[in-house]
C-alpha cells in the first residue's frame, strides 16, 4: 500500500460533503485501501444520543437552536476517533472539520503529527438555495427550517475564513 492520504471535505451544510465522502470511501475500499471516515456532524449526533453528560446536554441545546459549537467540542470528537482508530496505515477522510479559524492550526498540527503532509482538500461550492432544498429533504432533527439560514450564514462567516 502506498502512503496514507488525507482527504478534507469543506462545504456548507447540505452541500453534499457526506455523500461525496462516502463515495470516496467506497472507491478507496474497491482499491483495497483502508480508510477512516470522520464525519464531525455524525459524531456530534452520536455523542448527543449516547451520552447524558452535561456537555452532551449543552451540545444538544446549541445544535437544536441552530448554533455553532465551541471550538473544543468538534476537535475533541474527531481527535478521539484518531486516537482510538487511526494506526497510520489508513487513508483519512475528514468531513466537517475545521469549522472555525481556531480549528485550522489544530488540523494542521494533526496532519504534521501523523505525517500526512499533502492533504487533498475538496471544497464543495453550492448555492444557498440548493443547500436549503437538500437540508429540508434530509429530515434530520437538526435541519430545522428556521435555523438553516443561520447555519449557511455561519459557514460564510466562520468556515470560509478557516479554509483560507
Segments the model singles out, each with a brief description of its role:
Residues 1-164:
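Glycine-rich phosphate-binding loop of ATP-dependent small-molecule kinases
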